[in-house]
Amino acid sequence: MAGPRETIPPGNSGEETIGEAFEWLDRTVEAINREAVNHLPRELIFQVWQRSWRYWHDEQGMSISYTKYRYLCLMQKAMFIHSKRGCTCLGGGHGPGGWRSGPPPPPPPGLV
């Protein structure tokens, strides 16, 4: 028989927590994208999104949630550096950015 320390407390099976974490990740990725578009060129945001998927998901075989997490870390760092260097955007944003030739990549979540 399992001791009291070995049982899972009621309401903490882990399933709810995992589901909530995935929802938080999706909401946070969308939120940072909506804010980043006011500070960073759209093409930069799109390229980071595409390259994150290509590298972490396609090449390394990591899960979708891990790929989103790595993308989120990169975007948080980009936003931090942008702010640290003295953001003067004042919500004006950078517009669509200078697209390369050819069609633009599909947008990341929150920028559809």
Curated annotation (Swiss-Prot):
Residues 102-112 have a biased composition (Pro residues). Residues 92-112 are annotated as: Disordered. One of its GO terms (cellular component) is host cell nucleus. InterPro entries: Lentiviral_Vpx_assoc_factor (IPR053711), RetroV_VpR/X (IPR000012). The lineage of its organism: Viruses, Riboviria, Pararnavirae, Artverviricota, Revtraviricetes. This is Protein Vpx. Residues 61-80 are annotated as: Binds to human NUP153. Keywords: AIDS, Host nucleus, Host-virus interaction, Inhibition of host innate immune response by virus, Viral immunoevasion, Virion. GO terms for biological process: symbiont-mediated suppression of host innate immune response; viral life cycle. Belongs to the lentivirus VPX protein family. Interacts with the P6 region of unprocessed GAG. Interacts with host VPRBP/DCAF1, leading to change substrate specificity of the CUL4A-DDB1 E3 ligase complex. Interacts with host NUP153. A motif (Nuclear localization signal) lies at residues 65-72. It is found in: Virion; Host nucleus. Plays a role in nuclear translocation of the viral pre-integration complex (PIC), thus is required for the virus to infect non-dividing cells. Targets specific host proteins for degradation by the 26S proteasome. Acts by associating with the cellular CUL4A-DDB1 E3 ligase complex through direct interaction with host VPRPB/DCAF-1. This change in the E3 ligase substrate specificity results in the degradation of host SAMHD1. In turn, SAMHD1 depletion allows viral replication in host myeloid cells by preventing SAMHD1-mediated hydrolysis of intracellular dNTPs necessary for reverse transcription. Pfam families: VPR. The keyword Transmembrane helix does not apply.
